[in-house]
Amino acid sequence: DQISKSKSIGVYSINDSQMNGENQNQLHTHLSDLITKHDLVIVSDYGHGFISRETAKHISKLSIFTSLNAQINAANIGYHTLNNYQNIDCVIINETELRHELRDRESDHEELMKELSKNLQSKNLVVTQGSGGATLFNSESEKYHYCPAFAGKIVDKVGAGDAMLALISCSLKSGFSPDLGLFMGSLAAAQSVETIGNSIPVNKIQLIKTFSHAVK
């Protein structure tokens, strides 16, 4: 909407067919070669055919810090699942995706987080709740960590989860505490929702200024 500068509707056309076996094997080989040159792997699985069950299993076995966002959307609901992954260091989903994964819309979300974390053998599970902020469950300490939502103006939510995924992944990989990692990710997500799509990247200087102001 050019007047309100907010997103009204999105229309997508996607080829979500699976890759053939030869291309999939090439992808696995390429991934195995790449991890020797990098510090962490960030996976965004949108459920449109690029990452098959076999590729998800291959990713799960990579000997490197790995983070995952496997989202449910209108095109893949009922077909997409997190269960193809195991031993992921950091998983980020929203509360709707959490409840869909466990087929439970009534139970307390913290209990569901603990259950899903156990099923996936994930070290850190982050669940975003829109205006309710975000919760992180660490399976090693069995503690929950909380952070409020910081967004002042919401224009478009697309990309917020990706921004949070990137910042939390880098923070946890660098040895930050779960509280600090969740805080940094939430600040990045708040920046992201203030613009249409990914038209403007998360600004490092603004992020540092906001962080400095918040901790004073």
PLM feature segments, named:
Residues 53-144:
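Conserved phosphate/ATP/ADP-binding segment of small-molecule kinases
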Residues 85-91, 132-161, 208-215:
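Flexible glycine/proline-rich, aromatic-decorated loop/lid segments
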Residues 14-17, 97-99, 152-153:
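A short, flexible beta-alpha/helix-coil linker loop
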Residues 123-124, 150-213:
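Conserved post-catalytic alpha-helical subdomain immediately downstream of the catalytic base
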Residues 1-42, 62, 203-216:
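Conserved N-terminal subdomain of the carbohydrate kinase-like
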Residues 17-22, 33-37, 103-111, 139-144, ...:
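Short, glycine- and charge-enriched coil/turn segments that flank and shape catalytic ligand pockets
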Residues 40-43, 47, 56:
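Long hydrophobic segments that form regular secondary structure
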Residues 45-46, 70-72, 92-96, 102, ...:
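Active-site proximal loops enriched in glycine and acidic residues that flank catalytic Cys/His/Asp
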